[in-house]
Amino acid sequence: MFLLYEYDIFWAFLIISSAIPILAFLISGVLAPIRKGPEKLSSYESGIEPMGDAWLQFRIRYYMFALVFVVLDVETVFLYPWAMSFDVLGVPVFIEAFIFVLILIVGSVYAWRKGALEWS
């Protein structure tokens, strides 16, 4: 039989950490004033009136750089706990981490070859 009572703290943390943002959005939606006017429709750029059109389309390159950053950031999240417990885990986990890094290197080379990392 599973001992689910050992996870009571986890479930309490999960419920509380989910309830706080939901309550924040609900309270701000109820308390926020609803006024429609020309100021709501204008864009705000550091306290001054915008010069030209405020609605610009971003180039797809920004999204590609963001995607590569997220992939490398997730790689760091997975590799940091492994690096902290490297001496305890031993060689089999080292081989698994090596394969993980190898897959990420192959993906980075693929993105580089496809031109995802080119700025111009």
From Swiss-Prot:
The chain crosses the membrane at residues 9-29, 64-84, 88-108. It is an enzyme of class 7 (translocase). It is found in: Plastid, Chloroplast thylakoid membrane. GO terms for molecular function: NADH dehydrogenase (ubiquinone) activity; quinone binding. Gene3D superfamilies: NADH:ubiquinone/plastoquinone oxidoreductase, chain 3. It comes from the Eukaryota. It holds the Pfam family Oxidored_q4. It catalyses: a plastoquinone + NADH + (n+1) H(+)(in) = a plastoquinol + NAD(+) + n H(+)(out); a plastoquinone + NADPH + (n+1) H(+)(in) = a plastoquinol + NADP(+) + n H(+)(out). One of its GO terms (biological process) is photosynthesis, light reaction. It is a multi-pass membrane protein. Keywords: Chloroplast, Membrane, NAD, NADP, Plastid, Plastoquinone, Quinone, Thylakoid, Translocase, Transmembrane, Transmembrane helix, Transport. Its EC number is 7.1.1.-. GO terms for cellular component: chloroplast thylakoid membrane; NADH dehydrogenase complex. NDH is composed of at least 16 different subunits, 5 of which are encoded in the nucleus. NDH shuttles electrons from NAD(P)H:plastoquinone, via FMN and iron-sulfur (Fe-S) centers, to quinones in the photosynthetic chain and possibly in a chloroplast respiratory chain. The immediate electron acceptor for the enzyme in this species is believed to be plastoquinone. Couples the redox reaction to proton translocation, and thus conserves the redox energy in a proton gradient. Belongs to the complex I subunit 3 family. This is NAD(P)H-quinone oxidoreductase subunit 3, chloroplastic. It comes from Gossypium barbadense. The gene is ndhC.
